Amino acid sequence: MDLAEYKGIYVIAEQFEGKLRDVSFELLGQARILADTIGDEVGAILIGKDVKPLAQELIAHGAHKVYVYDDPQLEHYNTTAYAKVICDFFHEEKPNVFLVGATNIGRDLGPRVANSLKTGLTADCTQLGVDDDKKTIVWTRPALGGNIMAEIICPDNRPQMGTVRPHVFKKPEADPSATGEVIEKKANLSDADFMTKFVELIKLGGEGVKIEDADVIVAGGRGMNSEEPFKTGILKECADVLGGAVGASRAAVDAGWIDALHQVGQTGKTVGPKIYIACAISGAIQPLAGMTGSDCIIAINKDEDAPIFKVCDYGIVGDVFKVLPLLTEAIKKQKGIA
């Protein structure tokens, strides 16, 4: 394999029902940083039905080129068909790097493509960089149960591939004046490429604001002791007053106190709210991996030596069952809520 033939950092853009996912923009922002470092260009691959109008949004967020596969057969995600499209693109265009969102779709599509192309894939990256040779991407991710951060490279194969969780990187500001090239491609598909059939989309319900969309998250850990603070008690009350969502550590979810949809951390969701209030969360690497993208972290913990105090913006040493109700009442007073 002549590595010099492979050019371009490409984001596999993800859209749902005609709307681009924010993770696609976040990856484009990071792709531009990497491309500027190694002197390469940024591209995006867009797949679906009636998706061509979305190409300009990708250009506005950093793509120099957008390759569009607009096909009625590709309206709904299909693992084998989408993988065939991406693999065909690789053989035709020879990209250097594929960046994929660590979403439900990305976690399915990325490994399938990597396996087909006989290359490596680093999953759930929290940081991207460039090796000293200015050619090899350095993928950083938690390892050994989240106790260390591993740096992984793929020096001898192409494409270099990795998945990145939503909200790990900031979404860049759109530049409406940006220009780029939109290239329409034809998907070369047969019935054999569709090993599954889309039957029905069932959207999961859920009360309140989703944690991945929330501007404020009030999260609890093992120290909450029961489900009551999450469902009706102090965490829920504070989140409701702030118009936010309730989050939880893995320990709280494993204890059965709250649904896994609320889990923040290495094995849960990665979030990037304006305010993250961590209640009785010690600050081990696992939950920190999901919250460090927050603009402001406020920690409440009775253990003054808890690791969370090393990463938070504001720390309160005290009993969360005493401190948080006082904080909630102060917010109510400030807002004029009875």
From Swiss-Prot:
GO molecular function: electron transfer activity; flavin adenine dinucleotide binding
Gene3D superfamilies attached to this UniProt entry: HUPs, TPP-binding domain
Residues involved in FAD binding: 275-303
Cofactor binding summary note: Binds 2 FAD per dimer.
Top-rank taxon, per record: Bacteria
Cofactor(s) the protein needs: FAD
GO BP field: fatty acid beta-oxidation using acyl-CoA dehydrogenase
Keyword terms of this UniProt record: Electron transport, FAD, Flavoprotein, Transport
One Pfam family of this chain: ETF
InterPro entries assigned: DHS-like_NAD/FAD-binding_dom, ETF_a/b_N, ETF_a/FixB, ETF_alpha_N, ETF_asu_C, ETF_asu_C_CS, Rossmann-like_a/b/a_fold
Protein task: The electron transfer flavoprotein serves as a specific electron acceptor for other dehydrogenases. It transfers the electrons to the main respiratory chain via ETF-ubiquinone oxidoreductase (ETF dehydrogenase).
Assembly and binders: Heterodimer of an alpha and a beta subunit.
Family label: Belongs to the ETF alpha-subunit/FixB family.
Name this polypeptide is given: Electron transfer flavoprotein subunit alpha
Annotated gene: etfA
